[in-house]
């Protein structure tokens, strides 16, 4: 090849590769979950309720991630943005704030909401927000048949299913759905997991490690707690 044409070849190759690169982008709708807010709970240690703000979000993210048609944003990415931008510092997060966070993490939908635990009677209200318009598309309330604190995991599973439907996602395959229903995380383990996330966000690795381990002891097959333990230990 003549010298003057040699530099053109790599450039041409690069141009030819560009459509393939852009075509490989993830076009699935992004969903992100904000920390849930305590709507006025009684009967437990306050630290448990503070922790559930993270834990409910963490478990909903895990359940939504079962659907391959969605791109679910990691909880830590949302929390990092909230901390960096001091969003929701007053304890209140509205749809506009959620939409702002959603745009920053590249989500189409944001999930936000509140929970109330009145001496063991548990309720969760979730709101699905359109990131483009800041509009609340749907308020999804937990199944009134699942109101006991001991049924928290089943309650969150059912809530995630409804959020998938409201986000126009296809239902889970029967195989994935059956595997999900075969799993039931005890509330004790979920509480420990929530505490671990709280300490992780506070930068207390020792406490986070302790509570991830407690969650795994209470439920040895707790994949989310095992993954959390790897993150805080740097494995």
Language model region names:
Residues 26-95, 110-117, 139, 178-181:
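Short beta-strand->alpha-helix linker/helix-N-cap micro-motif
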Residues 79-186:
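Catalytic-center loop of serine/cysteine hydrolases
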Residues 181-200:
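Alpha-helical tetratricopeptide repeat
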């Amino acid at each position: 090849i003549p010298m003057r044409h040699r530099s053109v070849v790599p450039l041409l190759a690069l141009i030819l590769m560009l459509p393939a690169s852009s075509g490989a982008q993830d076009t699935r709708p992004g969903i992100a979950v904000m920390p849930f807010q305590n709507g006025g709970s009684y009967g437990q240690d306050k630290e448990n309720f503070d922790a559930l703000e993270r834990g409910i979000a963490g478990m909903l993210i895990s359940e939504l991630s079962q659907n391959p048609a969605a791109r679910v944003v990691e909880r830590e990415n949302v929390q990092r943005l909230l901390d960096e931008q001091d969003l929701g510092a007053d304890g209140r997060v509205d749809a506009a704030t959620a939409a702002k966070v959603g745009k920053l993490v590249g989500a189409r939908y944001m999930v936000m909401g509140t929970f109330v635990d009145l001496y063991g009677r548990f309720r969760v209200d979730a709101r699905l927000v359109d990131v483009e318009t800041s509009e609340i598309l749907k308020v999804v309330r937990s199944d009134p048949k699942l109101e006991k604190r001991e049924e928290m995991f089943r309650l969150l599973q059912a809530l995630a299913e409804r959020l998938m439907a409201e986000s126009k996602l296809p239902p889970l395959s029967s195989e994935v759905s059956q595997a999900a229903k075969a799993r039931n995380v005890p509330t004790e383990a979920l509480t420990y997991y929530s505490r671990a996330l709280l300490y992780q966000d506070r930068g207390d690795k020792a406490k986070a490690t302790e509570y991830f381990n407690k969650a795994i002891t209470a439920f040895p097959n707790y994949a989310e707690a095992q993954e959390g333990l790897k993150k805080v230990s740097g494995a």
